[in-house]
């Protein structure tokens, strides 16, 4: 028997001088998947394919990622505007389930808090965490800067492919500092979301073999979720024995 395939359609969303490639396929309840920083539709292909078996899935690339065009701004608000443009311009028969991974989870919470009734619910994957302490601070800044400079260097080998990411190491660092600030007040955003919220979180966010700094980051990550659940005990939370790459490694 031949394998069953799902028909997909590709469109472009134009806004703010940026072209966002959008792919839609599957059948069922509408679902919009917002990727994270340094993550593309191509990276999330396995997850997208699985979701299409039960949902009408809309997937896209954020500015500077995949085949989306580059931009002059890579701020939190700029990425939020990409998500808003997709949700505004793609015609859906009913409010979608909004799934966000990493940075995409933070964008999803902000969008839902600003557009009551525009989404049916949120599924947040390892992001939008009201951590009690910022991640990029003090002695860790140098280590993060080196890590993201190395990532940007490796990303250059992907230019012209569906997995390319155009941000520099400094732009990645600056955005993560901004995300720390966003998460310091995100509890207020959660209080304005009156739709079902589910979370899928990594138990070892920083990964294995990263020493005391990694263990401290993991404790901070878990403490943030505990803080959220005290404020919103209705949020359903699942912990996976995985690191922050869980959307790529644990899609099945």
What are these regions (language model features)?
Residues 18-69:
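Conserved HGGG/HGGXW glycine-rich cap/lid loop of the alpha/beta-hydrolase fold
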Residues 23, 58-99, 141:
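Active-site loop/oxyanion-hole signature of alpha/beta-hydrolase fold enzymes
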Residues 1-31, 52-55, 92-93, 120, ...:
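Alpha/beta-hydrolase fold catalytic core
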Residues 161-241, 247:
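Conserved serine/cysteine hydrolase catalytic core
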Residues 94-136:
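Conserved hydrolase catalytic core segment
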Residues 248-252:
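Post-His helix in hydrolase/transferase enzymes
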Residues 61, 125-126, 200:
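Alpha/beta-hydrolase-fold catalytic nucleophile elbow
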Residues 39-40, 65, 130, 207, ...:
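Active-site loop signature of alpha/beta-hydrolase-fold enzymes
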């Amino acid at each position: 028997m031949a394998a069953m395939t799902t028909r997909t359609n590709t469109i472009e969303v134009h806004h703010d001088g940026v072209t966002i490639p959008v792919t839609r396929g599957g059948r069922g309840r509408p679902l919009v998947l917002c990727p994270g920083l340094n993550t593309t539709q191509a990276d999330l292909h396995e997850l997208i394919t699985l979701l299409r078996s039960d949902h009408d899935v809309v997937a896209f690339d954020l500015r500077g990622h995949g085949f989306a065009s580059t931009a002059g701004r890579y701020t939190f608000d700029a990425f939020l505007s990409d998500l808003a443009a997709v949700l505004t311009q793609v015609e859906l028969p009913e409010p979608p389930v909004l799934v966000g991974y990493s940075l995409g989870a933070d964008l999803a919470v902000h969008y839902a808090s600003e557009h009551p009734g525009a989404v049916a619910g949120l599924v947040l994957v390892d992001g939008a965490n009201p951590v009690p302490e910022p991640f990029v601070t003090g002695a860790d800044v140098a280590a993060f800067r080196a890590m993201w400079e190395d990532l940007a260097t490796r990303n250059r080998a992907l230019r012209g492919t569906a997995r390319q990411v155009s941000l520099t190491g400094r732009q990645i660092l600056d955005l993560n500092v901004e995300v720390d600030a966003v998460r310091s007040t995100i509890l207020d955003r959660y209080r304005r979301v009156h739709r079902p919220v589910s979370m899928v979180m990594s138990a070892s966010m920083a990964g294995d073999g990263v020493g005391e700094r990694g263990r401290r980051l993991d404790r901070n990550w878990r403490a943030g979720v505990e803080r959220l659940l005290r404020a919103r005990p209705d949020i359903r939370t699942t912990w996976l024995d995985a690191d922050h790459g869980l959307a790529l490694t644990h899609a099945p």
